[in-house]
């Protein structure tokens, strides 16, 4: 049974006898998915039928062919798995609100379940339904182990304030998922034949950013990637995770972003290991506390992608150093083409453009240099988000917005020694990177 704290009822109707749909969005899987499970519970409770629907929006937050291809190939695998279990799946291209309203009227839906999502655009879509439909509507948080609304009811200052709140509730929410069984074929919903190649071709999107081949999408591959990380990489994670030349990271972030794997499943598998150590502690800190801190920031601060509502000390130091002379100033086009004076930064940009996944340490360095070499912090934030969302497989995500805000505006950080341009925002430089890893090796790899 889904814990009631995961569920928020956002619209109610006395008319409860009717069909159920699970509007899949952020959590693109049916295994280990509390939203799907809750919709299935409603199906059983009301002795009715249920289908999964997915809204295929054009040009979602400037996503490109790279991200859409990864997502749609994952959805095709999901669709095939659901088909085998006689669970109907509908792909609805076009405006999400209008297409869902039409679907709900056509099939006389009485219960709608959707994924929790803190981003403005998703909440706008959800409000468009809750404000206009007289049916029962529920939000379920299956993306976070401790549901974001339960973890905290306000914007937290940093990991140090959210961590104890999560730790107090973690054991309660870290339960095992039930198995999903095959069902009888439905009468009301038809098992659809979906041409995913045609769906991909129909999209009005940027086709210049091409898919990457080093990572394969889908729930099955996500689980293989997890088990490879546990068996081959986890034992050195804490020592090597800040070395971009070491293949020490999990590579799970694209799967987490698209919901092709559950953070809760990852944690459950990691915690099965016989001996807890600093590698496990470090990884779970990133997976749980830092990831959920990003959702917290975006949930309780609708200006998550700009410099409104940043910490007071950061706002003051940015104003104090706004007019400081910059030694270098680059345009968006120069940043995008990796045409700066610094080979290390150019290598990081090339890594992102070529692979769709910049190393975590370099993401911090990359964003801080954009602050240093832009006309203003506001311009730096726009450039960093634009490039991150355009090229990263895991772009358009709370983690990305908060990562840029941390680097550029001191969000979830503290004041550091004051210096030109940065003020009291944490500083990173080339010499610091040299002390951490073989900079020349990294540069040669990505600038060749």
Annotated model-derived regions:
Residues 35, 74, 78, 222-229, ...:
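Alpha-helical packing segments of well-folded alpha/beta enzyme cores
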Residues 4-6, 42-47, 67-71, 190-196, ...:
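Short, functional N-terminal and low-complexity linear motifs
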Residues 65, 69, 213-216, 220, ...:
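Charge-dense, low-complexity intrinsically disordered segments
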Residues 1-177, 350, 369-374, 379, ...:
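Trp/Phe/Arg-rich N-terminal binding region typifying the photolyase-homology
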Residues 26, 243-440, 446-447:
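Active-site-proximal binding-pocket segments
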Residues 16, 148, 154-310, 437-448:
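Glycine/tryptophan-enriched, flexible segments
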């Amino acid at each position: 049974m889904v814990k009631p704290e995961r569920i928020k009822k956002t619209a109610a109707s006395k008319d409860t006898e009717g069909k159920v749909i699970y509007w899949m969005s952020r959590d693109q899987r049916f295994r280990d998915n509390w939203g799907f499970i809750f919709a299935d519970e409603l199906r059983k409770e009301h002795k009715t039928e249920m289908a999964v629907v997915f809204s295929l929006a054009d040009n979602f937050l400037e996503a490109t062919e790279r991200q859409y291809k990864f997502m749609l190939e994952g959805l095709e695998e999901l669709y095939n798995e659901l088909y085998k279990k006689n669970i109907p799946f509908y792909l609805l291209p076009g405006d999400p609100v209008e297409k869902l309203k039409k679907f709900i009227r056509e099939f006389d839906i009485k219960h709608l379940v959707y994924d929790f999502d803190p981003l403005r655009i998703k909440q706008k879509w959800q409000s468009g339904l809750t404000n206009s439909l007289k049916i029962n509507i529920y939000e379920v948080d299956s993306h976070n182990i401790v549901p974001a609304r339960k973890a905290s009811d306000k914007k937290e200052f940093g990991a140090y304030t959210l961590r104890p709140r999560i730790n107090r509730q973690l054991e309660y929410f870290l339960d095992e998922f039930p198995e999903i069984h095959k069902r009888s074929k439905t009468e009301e919903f038809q098992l659809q034949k979906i041409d995913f190649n045609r769906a991909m071709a129909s999209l009005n999107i940027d086709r210049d950013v091409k898919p990457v081949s080093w990572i394969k999408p889908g729930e099955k591959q996500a689980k293989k990637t997890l088990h490879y990380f546990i068996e081959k990489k986890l034992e050195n994670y804490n020592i090597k995770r800040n070395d971009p030349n070491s293949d020490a990271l999990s590579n799970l972030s694209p799967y987490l972003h698209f919901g092709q794997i559950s953070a809760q499943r990852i944690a459950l598998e990691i915690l099965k290991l016989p001996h807890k150590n600093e590698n496990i502690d470090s990884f779970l800190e990133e997976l749980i506390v830092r990831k959920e801190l990003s959702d917290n920031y975006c949930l309780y601060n609708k200006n998550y992608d700009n410099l409104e509502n940043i910490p007071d000390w950061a706002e003051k130091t940015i104003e104090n150093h706004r007019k400081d002379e910059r030694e270098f100033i680059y345009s968006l086009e120069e940043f995008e083409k990796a045409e700066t004076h610094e080979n290390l930064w150019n290598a990081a940009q090339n890594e992102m453009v070529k692979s769709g996944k910049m190393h975590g340490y370099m993401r911090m360095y990359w964003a801080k240099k954009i602050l240093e070499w832009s006309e203003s912090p506001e311009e730096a934030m726009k450039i960093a988000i634009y490039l991150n969302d355009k090229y990263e497989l895991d772009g358009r995500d709370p983690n990305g917005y908060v990562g840029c805000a941390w680097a550029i505006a001191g969000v979830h950080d503290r004041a550091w020694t004051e210096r030109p341009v940065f003020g009291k925002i944490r500083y990173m430089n080339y010499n610091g990177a040299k002390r951490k890893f073989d900079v020349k090796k990294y540069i040669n790899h990505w600038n060749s």
